[in-house]
């Protein structure tokens, strides 16, 4: 309801007459993005910072209300402002032919590009690019991802489609999508959200293989324990830790001497907000001994094995 009212207000601001037959944006669809596609989009977007990058999305149209994005691939275009260059048709054709040889028979259902640091919305050039996609596929989608605002556990991403100025087909009935769409930002509203284009709900699906892939993404291997640092690096690390232990020892000795000068009723609050040298000294000694014991055993094992 809020998005409908905002759309009507936006059209009224443009001087359009509001009637009962005025078509509203169709936001009933849901885009299901696979984990592989999401990871590849984020990796490509972060590699291109501070420039914008773009790519194409491969997937399938499940039904009238569901679009599934299975995979993506990067395009050689990049941009320096809030827009990217046009699509390279030669590169796109060659890439699709090579993907078909690997078993990727999905069609191009849209494109994605990055907005590093300034949110998810479409510029005027992006709207024109999206309209060119919709001429080939009426249900094409434009996905925008912000790699700088994205943090672990929360990805700043949104999907858009342009609003037809003079639709010929009757708009279909849709259900409420309240709670599924992201709240629009002020910057997106200024740049034409709900006026030139509208947002589409995004969902993330994970099958059994994708769950295993995500679990093994940063999984450590047992062979990492056999890796030995350089002797010069290890010597410098030991020297730094020993100097730190010497400094903590002096602080601990000074704290013991100061305890005799402090009144008994003030001893409980005298150490509040200060570094506890005794606790840090014990922790650093255990860490230093454990690291050196593990290193000696690793060097002995490597010498005998190799």
Curated annotation (Swiss-Prot):
Keywords: Hydrolase, Metal-binding, Metalloprotease, Protease, Proteasome, Ubl conjugation pathway, Zinc. Residues 31-166 form the MPN domain. Zn(2+) binds at residues 113, 115, 126. Its EC number is 3.4.19.-. GO terms for cellular component: nucleus; phagocytic vesicle; proteasome complex; proteasome regulatory particle, lid subcomplex. Signal peptide: none annotated. SUPFAM superfamilies: JAB1/MPN domain (SSF102712). One of its GO terms (molecular function) is metal-dependent deubiquitinase activity. It is an enzyme of class 3 (hydrolase). A motif (JAMM motif) lies at residues 113-126. GO terms for biological process: proteasome-mediated ubiquitin-dependent protein catabolic process. Belongs to the peptidase M67A family. PSMD14 subfamily. Component of the 19S regulatory cap of the 26S proteasome. Metalloprotease component of the 26S proteasome that specifically cleaves 'Lys-63'-linked polyubiquitin chains. The 26S proteasome is involved in the ATP-dependent degradation of ubiquitinated proteins. The function of the 'Lys-63'-specific deubiquitination of the proteasome is unclear. PANTHER family: EUKARYOTIC TRANSLATION INITIATION FACTOR 3 -RELATED (PTHR10410). This is 26S proteasome non-ATPase regulatory subunit 14. The lineage of its organism: Eukaryota, Amoebozoa, Evosea, Eumycetozoa, Dictyostelia.
């Amino acid at each position: 309801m809020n998005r409908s009212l905002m759309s009507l207000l936006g059209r009224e601001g443009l001087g359009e007459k509001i009637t009962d037959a005025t078509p509203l944006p169709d936001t009933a669809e849901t885009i299901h993005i696979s984990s592989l596609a999401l990871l590849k989009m984020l990796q490509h977007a972060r590699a291109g910072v501070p420039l914008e990058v773009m790519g194409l999305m491969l997937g399938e149209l499940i039904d009238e209300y569901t679009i599934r994005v299975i995979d993506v691939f990067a395009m050689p275009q990049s941009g320096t402002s809030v827009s990217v260059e046009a699509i390279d048709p030669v590169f796109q054709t060659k890439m699709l032919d090579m993907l078909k040889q690997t078993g990727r028979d999905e069609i191009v259902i849209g494109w994605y590009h990055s907005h590093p640091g300034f949110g998810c919305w479409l510029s005027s050039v992006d709207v024109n690019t999206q309209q060119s996609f919709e001429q080939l596929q009426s249900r094409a989608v434009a996905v925008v991802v912000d790699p700088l605002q994205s943090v672990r556990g929360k990805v700043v991403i949104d999907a858009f489609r342009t609003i037809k100025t003079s639709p010929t087909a009757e708009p279909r009935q849709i259900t409420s999508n309240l709670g599924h769409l992201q709240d629009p930002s002020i910057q997106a509203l200024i740049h034409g959200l709900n006026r030139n284009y509208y947002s589409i709900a995004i969902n993330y699906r994970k099958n059994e293989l994708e769950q295993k892939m995500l679990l093994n993404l940063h999984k450590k291997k047992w062979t990492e324990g056999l890796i030995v640092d350089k002797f010069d690096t290890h010597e410098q690390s030991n020297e730094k830790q020993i100097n730190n232990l010497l400094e903590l020892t002096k602080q601990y000795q000074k704290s013991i001497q100061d305890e005799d000068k402090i009144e008994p009723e003030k001893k409980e609050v005298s150490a509040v907000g200060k570094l506890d040298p005794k606790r840090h000294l014990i922790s650093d000694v255990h860490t230093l001994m454990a690291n050196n014991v593990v290193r000696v055993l690793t060097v002995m094992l490597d010498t005998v094995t190799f």
